[in-house]
Regions:
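Feature detects amphipathic, helix-rich regulatory segments
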Residues: 1-147
C-alpha cells in the first residue's frame, strides 16, 4: 500500500522493485497459477515486494512490456507449471525459473509486439466496458418495463 509502510534503507534496497523487474508468484494452491508473473512497468515510482514473490531484476536488454506478454504465453506458462513441485502447495523456485527457455526477438520486434498486445488489451477493456454498460442498460430497462 503506497505511502502506508516504512522500510529501512537496507530493506528498501533488498526489496525494491524498479521498472522492468519481473515478479513471480512463488507458491500456489493449484498447478495453473504456480509461477504466474507480472512485470513492473511504472517508470516513475519504485515499490517493494514481499516474501511470497520471486523478483527477477532487469539485467539485460529487453522490452519489459514484451516480457510481460511473453511470460503469460501458453508455451512459457507450460514450461513453468511443468517444473513446479508440491502436493498441497505448488511451489516454483528461482532455479526452476532459470531453466525456462525464452526466445527473444530483436529489441525492435519486442517493442512492436509489446505495443500490439497492449493495444489489443486496451481494445478488449474498452469493449468489455461497453458490453457491461449495455448489460446494465438492458437490466435497467427490463426492471422498469416489468415492475
Amino acid at each position: 500500500v503506497r505511502g502506508k509502510a516504512r522500510l529501512s534503507d537496507e530493506e528498501a534496497s533488498r526489496y525494491c522493485v524498479e521498472y522492468g523487474d519481473v515478479l513471480f508468484q512463488r507458491s500456489s494452491e493449484n498447478q495453473e497459477d504456480a509461477g504466474t508473473s507480472n512485470v513492473y512497468l511504472d517508470q516513475h515510482v519504485s515499490s517493494a515486494f514481499g516474501g511470497f514473490v520471486i523478483r527477477g531484476k532487469k539485467v539485460g536488454e529487453y522490452n519489459p512490456l514484451f516480457i510481460k506478454y511473453l511470460l503469460g504465453s501458453s508455451s512459457i506458462r507450460e514450461q513453468i507449471t511443468h517444473r513446479a513441485q508440491g502436493a498441497q502447495h505448488i511451489n516454483v523456485s528461482q532455479d526452476t525459473l532459470a531453466d525456462v527457455a525464452l526466445m527473444m526477438p530483436s529489441m525492435r520486434e519486442q517493442e512492436a509486439a509489446g505495443l500490439v498486445f497492449l493495444h489489443l488489451d486496451n481494445l478488449i477493456t474498452l469493449h468489455q466496458r461497453k458490453l457491461n454498460l449495455l448489460k446494465n442498460t438492458k437490466k435497467s430497462l427490463l426492471n422498469k418495463m416489468f415492475v
